[in-house]
Amino acid sequence: MNKTQVPSLITSQSWYVIDAKNQKLGRMSTHISNILRGKNKPSYTPYLDTGDYVIVINSSEVSVSGNKTTQKLYRRHSGQPGGLKVETFEQLQTRLPNRIVEKSVKGMLPKGPLGRKLFTKLKVYPGPSHPHAAQKPQEYMV
Protein backbone atom coordinates (compact mmCIF):
# COMPACT_ATOMS: atom_id res chain seq x y z
CA MET A 1 0.00 0.00 0.00
CA ASN A 2 1.43 3.37 -1.01
CA LYS A 3 1.35 6.24 1.43
CA THR A 4 0.72 9.80 0.35
CA GLN A 5 2.74 11.12 3.30
CA VAL A 6 6.41 10.21 3.51
CA PRO A 7 7.45 10.26 7.20
CA SER A 8 11.07 11.22 6.42
CA LEU A 9 9.95 14.54 4.91
CA ILE A 10 8.55 15.83 8.19
CA THR A 11 10.04 19.17 9.20
CA SER A 12 12.08 19.75 12.32
CA GLN A 13 10.41 20.44 15.63
CA SER A 14 10.55 23.90 17.15
CA TRP A 15 9.98 25.23 20.67
CA TYR A 16 7.27 27.68 21.79
CA VAL A 17 6.82 29.63 25.04
CA ILE A 18 3.31 30.39 26.27
CA ASP A 19 2.72 32.79 29.16
CA ALA A 20 -0.22 31.51 31.22
CA LYS A 21 -0.63 34.72 33.22
CA ASN A 22 -4.33 35.75 33.22
CA GLN A 23 -5.14 33.19 30.49
CA LYS A 24 -8.27 31.05 30.61
CA LEU A 25 -7.29 27.45 31.30
CA GLY A 26 -9.43 25.73 28.66
CA ARG A 27 -8.72 28.06 25.77
CA MET A 28 -4.99 28.03 26.45
CA SER A 29 -4.95 24.22 26.78
CA THR A 30 -6.64 23.88 23.38
CA HIS A 31 -3.88 25.91 21.73
CA ILE A 32 -1.22 23.88 23.55
CA SER A 33 -2.70 20.51 22.54
CA ASN A 34 -2.97 21.61 18.89
CA ILE A 35 0.71 22.61 18.87
CA LEU A 36 1.74 19.32 20.54
CA ARG A 37 -0.25 17.33 17.95
CA GLY A 38 1.12 19.37 15.04
CA LYS A 39 -2.29 20.50 13.80
CA ASN A 40 -0.90 23.96 13.10
CA LYS A 41 1.37 22.55 10.36
CA PRO A 42 0.53 21.52 6.80
CA SER A 43 2.47 18.27 7.36
CA TYR A 44 0.05 17.07 10.08
CA THR A 45 -0.36 13.30 10.10
CA PRO A 46 -2.73 11.77 12.69
CA TYR A 47 -0.62 8.70 13.44
CA LEU A 48 2.79 10.45 13.63
CA ASP A 49 4.43 12.81 16.09
CA THR A 50 4.59 15.97 13.96
CA GLY A 51 4.13 18.46 16.80
CA ASP A 52 6.41 20.94 18.50
CA TYR A 53 7.62 21.43 22.06
CA VAL A 54 5.69 23.79 24.34
CA ILE A 55 6.98 25.59 27.44
CA VAL A 56 4.31 27.08 29.73
CA ILE A 57 5.46 29.73 32.20
CA ASN A 58 3.52 31.39 35.05
CA SER A 59 1.24 28.36 35.43
CA SER A 60 0.45 29.48 38.99
CA GLU A 61 -1.41 32.51 37.59
CA VAL A 62 -3.77 30.73 35.18
CA SER A 63 -7.46 31.64 35.59
CA VAL A 64 -10.82 29.97 35.15
CA SER A 65 -14.22 31.54 34.57
CA GLY A 66 -17.22 31.55 36.85
CA ASN A 67 -17.15 29.82 40.23
CA LYS A 68 -14.73 27.10 39.13
CA THR A 69 -12.06 28.27 41.59
CA THR A 70 -14.18 26.90 44.43
CA GLN A 71 -16.42 24.39 42.63
CA LYS A 72 -14.10 22.52 40.23
CA LEU A 73 -12.82 19.35 41.89
CA TYR A 74 -9.68 17.35 41.17
CA ARG A 75 -9.80 13.74 42.33
CA ARG A 76 -7.06 11.17 42.79
CA HIS A 77 -7.02 7.76 44.42
CA SER A 78 -4.21 6.06 46.31
CA GLY A 79 -5.45 2.56 45.50
CA GLN A 80 -6.20 1.77 49.13
CA PRO A 81 -9.76 1.38 50.46
CA GLY A 82 -11.04 4.84 51.34
CA GLY A 83 -8.08 6.43 49.56
CA LEU A 84 -10.00 8.99 47.49
CA LYS A 85 -8.51 12.49 47.78
CA VAL A 86 -10.50 15.49 46.57
CA GLU A 87 -9.15 19.02 46.09
CA THR A 88 -10.65 22.19 44.67
CA PHE A 89 -9.00 24.24 41.93
CA GLU A 90 -7.92 26.81 44.51
CA GLN A 91 -6.26 24.24 46.78
CA LEU A 92 -4.44 22.49 43.94
CA GLN A 93 -3.27 25.81 42.52
CA THR A 94 -1.54 26.71 45.78
CA ARG A 95 -0.08 23.21 46.27
CA LEU A 96 0.91 22.12 42.72
CA PRO A 97 0.16 24.82 40.11
CA ASN A 98 1.78 22.80 37.28
CA ARG A 99 -0.61 19.89 37.71
CA ILE A 100 -3.66 21.95 36.68
CA VAL A 101 -2.25 22.79 33.23
CA GLU A 102 -0.82 19.29 32.78
CA LYS A 103 -4.13 17.56 33.55
CA SER A 104 -6.05 19.92 31.28
CA VAL A 105 -3.74 19.37 28.30
CA LYS A 106 -3.39 15.62 28.90
CA GLY A 107 -7.16 15.22 28.65
CA MET A 108 -7.07 16.81 25.18
CA LEU A 109 -4.36 14.52 23.80
CA PRO A 110 -4.99 11.05 22.32
CA LYS A 111 -5.16 8.15 24.71
CA GLY A 112 -2.46 5.56 24.04
CA PRO A 113 1.24 5.43 23.20
CA LEU A 114 1.18 8.48 20.88
CA GLY A 115 -0.54 10.63 23.49
CA ARG A 116 1.98 9.65 26.16
CA LYS A 117 4.84 10.54 23.80
CA LEU A 118 3.27 13.90 22.95
CA PHE A 119 2.75 14.70 26.64
CA THR A 120 6.50 14.47 27.29
CA LYS A 121 6.96 17.48 24.97
CA LEU A 122 5.04 19.74 27.38
CA LYS A 123 7.16 21.60 29.95
CA VAL A 124 5.28 23.55 32.66
CA TYR A 125 6.83 25.97 35.17
CA PRO A 126 5.07 27.96 37.94
CA GLY A 127 7.28 31.05 37.63
CA PRO A 128 8.41 33.32 34.77
CA SER A 129 11.74 31.52 34.17
CA HIS A 130 12.56 28.22 32.47
CA PRO A 131 15.80 26.28 31.78
CA HIS A 132 15.24 25.90 28.01
CA ALA A 133 16.94 29.07 26.74
CA ALA A 134 19.40 26.98 24.69
CA GLN A 135 16.53 25.76 22.47
CA LYS A 136 15.72 29.39 21.50
CA PRO A 137 11.94 29.12 21.96
CA GLN A 138 9.59 31.46 20.12
CA GLU A 139 6.92 33.50 21.92
CA TYR A 140 3.42 32.17 21.13
CA MET A 141 0.51 34.53 21.72
CA VAL A 142 -2.73 32.79 22.70
Curated annotation (Swiss-Prot):
A biological-process GO annotation: translation
UniProt keyword terms in alphabetical order: Chloroplast, Plastid, Ribonucleoprotein, Ribosomal protein
A GO-annotated cellular component: chloroplast
Pfam families given in the database record: Ribosomal_L13
A GO MF label: mRNA binding
Subcellular location: Plastid, Chloroplast
Listed CDD domains: Ribosomal_L13
Domain of life: Eukaryota
Subunit structure: Part of the 50S ribosomal subunit.
Family (UniProt): Belongs to the universal ribosomal protein uL13 family.
NCBIfam families referenced in this protein's UniProt entry, alphabetically: rplM_bact
Protein name: Large ribosomal subunit protein uL13c
Organism: Porphyra purpurea
Native organism taxonomy: Eukaryota, Rhodophyta, Bangiophyceae, Bangiales, Bangiaceae
Gene name as annotated: rpl13
